[in-house]
Amino acid sequence: MPTPKRRLGEVGEQAAAAYLERCGYTIIARNWRCRDGEIDLVAREGDQIVFVEVRTRHDQHALETITLAKQQRLVALAYHYLSAHDLPATTRWRIDVIALTARGGRIVDYDHVIAAVGED
C-alpha cells in the first residue's frame, strides 16, 4: 500500500500529465527509470523533448524543494534518456518543473516553470 506521500505524488503526476496534454504536449513516458534515478514525465512539445519534474506539496512552495544537487541529477538523467533512446546530439530538449499545491486531497494550484533547470 502506498504511503500518503507517495499517493500525493501520484495524484500530482497525474494532474501534471493531464495539464500538459491540455496545453498540447504529448506524454511519451511516465516514471522513466535508469540506474541513476527517475524522470517523472517525458513529453514532447513540437520538436522538443521536455523532461518534467513534478513536485506536489501541502505545506511549502514546491519549487523550494529543487536543490542544486537535484538539478544536477535531472540534467544527468536527461542525458541518460537521450542516450538510452539513441536520440541524436542535435535533439532539442529542456527540463521543466511543475509545482503543485494540494489541499484536502485536491490540486489547488499549478506553477509550470519552463526550462527551469539548465546545464549551468
Swiss-Prot record:
Signal peptide: none annotated. SUPFAM superfamilies: Restriction endonuclease-like. It comes from the Bacteria. GO terms for molecular function: nucleic acid binding. CDD domains: PoNe_Nuclease. Coiled coil: none annotated. It holds the Pfam family UPF0102. Belongs to the UPF0102 family. This is UPF0102 protein Caur_2698. It comes from Chloroflexus aurantiacus (strain ATCC 29366 / DSM 635 / J-10-fl).
